[in-house]
Amino acid sequence: MHINRISNFKEYQSHIQKNNRQIKVLRGIDFKLNQKIKTHKQFYIDGYSWTAQSNSKFLVDTLYSNGNELNLRERLICNKTKLNNRIRGCIHVFETLFKPQLRDKIYMTEQVSLLAKWMNNKYDNVVGSECFEDDTLMHKIKLLVKYFPSKIKHQDLTKLNFNSDIFNYVLSFDCFEHIPQYKKALKEVFRVLKPNGKLLFSVPFDLNSQSNLVRATISEGEIKHLTTPEYHGDPLSKKGCLSFYTLGGSC
């Protein structure tokens, strides 16, 4: 994997121009996959899986697509680990760039996902949590039964109940866009990180926008939608989790 450090929107545009030929090759691959799916309900392609540390097959299908273009970010499911393209990419970056040790203390903003299970199987000191949007007693009982004997830990990323300076790494994948006060959440993350600790996060990102799109706001518990509501997958809720932002160059 080639990892490029880009600090602002101008550097991103320069990167696109310099790597135009390679980007055309990648878009050509995308085009071929989108053409093939028109005549196949689903199919597999061969490749190397970082999380499996071996060759694997990857599922291509139309789930989460917009009807015109495949959602390769959320699909390309590894046949061995069952992790999607985005998650495998994040772990590839995490382990290649940061080189974590097995005993490092890691906090993840997820607990019941396939990734959380994979991380706990590999690393010795992983702490995970979920955020209960529905904190009614009935919902908590349903979750208790569903995930028994595991105990789901609730954390609000804007007010974590951890001591300061305790984690080597914090991993948060597609979480911050669901937090109205995401900058407050970032401050909390840096509070619980050790000196020289590192945060790795992913968010849905509009590569063509220099500013954030505010999709919804919340005041005194009342949500005001500014665009068509967008919900992302949530393992704790069938409804999904409301996205308050599509982040851009000003995030």
Regions found by a protein language model. Give the residues of each.
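N-terminal juxtadomain amphipathic helix
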Residues: N19-K105
